[in-house]
């Protein structure tokens, strides 16, 4: 804050009072270029700096207009006003070198200059001949200005600019100089885009994103180009509403067709460029190399993963092998210990048995009678076979530490216990056999008249027939019954129901019954073939080479080899059976021939049984 200095010594302070007139109101009108600029900014809601840029732009346009040089159109005076639609409006106004880039100010200035130069009144004053009305060429200047001053009509004329090059380069033209050929073509066609920021074609150093943006833009090109200027009919000339509608319909169809052709032209241009673009080829090769690298990396990763898995699997197998070996070693050691214990026990039992025999022998088997002594010897052997080690030891201790009478009593007591045990076991076995027989009778009770009389021969024949005609054979049980009726020696006729019932009962047989049936079959075999009596005193026998009969049953593998050999060596083959025998290891020529005959008989029997069943079924029908 600024303060005045105090008064000097000896000086006083003087106070002055002045009288002023009253304030008056006056109205002022704002004028001047500054006020004009302020009003413009306020109306446009723009700042002073923006307005300054606009002013500079207007000044630059004015300077361009001043610098614009019009080109004289030499054919202007020869133009036909009636054919104004086919004239070049830009050339008529002297803007042929500027064309679609000309501004409205330039068009207006060009028209003004052409009017000042070619107006009929001025030419008339100069003594030039003037045509009457619209027949004068000045009408062409007027029409040109009408077309170019109207934005809609100007766009229609620009769409069909006669100087525009609509050609599309071919693939062969751009094979070696792609960018030199296609760059100017895309630049001149970019004038038809509704979007202002048109991407450039670029060069070989352009990135994949830039190239992708470029082709995406042109494949989805949005063109403003339209062909209303080429309408053959003008709807203003129509005499009625229907005629005007018809003209509009025809014009729309023609415009749509021309628009379609234009879009096909653009699409052909883009397709040709894309197919010739060296960058696309480069990108494809890079993408292919990238995929190959990814594929190799993936395969390498997979290989490493498989190697790791295989390594882990081998480690697990090795661990399992070691564990198994350890377990087997433990089992082997345990088995060895058990075997040793068993051997020790066997030796002990053998020792006790021998001790029992010696003790009994010492006492002359407690009898002086030869028959009783032999019987006692049998009973002692029975004790040796049936008694456990502890019982044998206890019995031997008793025999060695007592008198003959006490030992005999102890031995007889032990023999009585063993015999009682054997008797009980035999009774239990007989009871099981009786129960099994009852069950068999119950299960086969409803099998028909023939089910009650089944001999061992019929049972064996049934088993053979069941094996001969396996499951899957047509009318299997009828065929089996027919086979049994043909080959049975009992004369009993069996039905399919009888055969099914007996087959089921055989399947349910107790194991003891099966053994009994097999034993009976073996007894019958011995009875039929006889048994060679054995000499009481066996002497070493001499071996004589003679025919050897092999009763070993044929295995599945031998059967397959035989069938294959029969197919390989037909009937007319020399030494056929010798070659067949060589193809079947372990079988002689005689074995192969015998097996072949058996197979033939089985097939014949099977066919005969099936045919008989088939004939019976036909007879029933």
UniProtKB/Swiss-Prot annotation:
One of its GO terms (biological process) is negative regulation of DNA biosynthetic process. Induction: Expression is repressed by CEBPA. Strongly overexpressed in leukemic cells. InterPro entries: DnaJ_domain, DnaJ_domain_CS, Homeodomain-like_sf, J_dom_sf, Myb_dom, RAC_head, RAC_head_sf, SANT/Myb. Keywords: Acetylation, Activator, Chaperone, Chromatin regulator, Cytoplasm, Nucleus, Phosphoprotein, Repeat, Transcription, Transcription regulation. SUPFAM superfamilies: Chaperone J-domain, Homeodomain-like. GO terms for cellular component: cytoplasm; cytosol; nuclear membrane; nucleolus; nucleoplasm; nucleus. Residues 160-250 are annotated as: ZRF1-UBD. Residues 449-511, 549-604 form the SANT domain. Widely expressed. Residues 88-161 form the J domain. The modification N-acetylmethionine is found at residue 1. Constitutes a myeloid leukemia-associated antigen and might be a target for leukemia T-cell therapy. Component of ribosome-associated complex (RAC), a heterodimer composed of Hsp70/DnaK-type chaperone HSPA14 and Hsp40/DnaJ-type chaperone DNAJC2. Interacts (via ZRF1-UBD region) with ID1. PANTHER family: DNAJ HOMOLOG SUBFAMILY C MEMBER 2. The ZRF1-UBD region specifically recognizes and binds H2AK119ub. The ZRF1-UBD region is also involved in protein-protein interactions with other proteins, suggesting that it may be masked by some regulator, thereby preventing its association with H2AK119ub. This is DnaJ homolog subfamily C member 2.
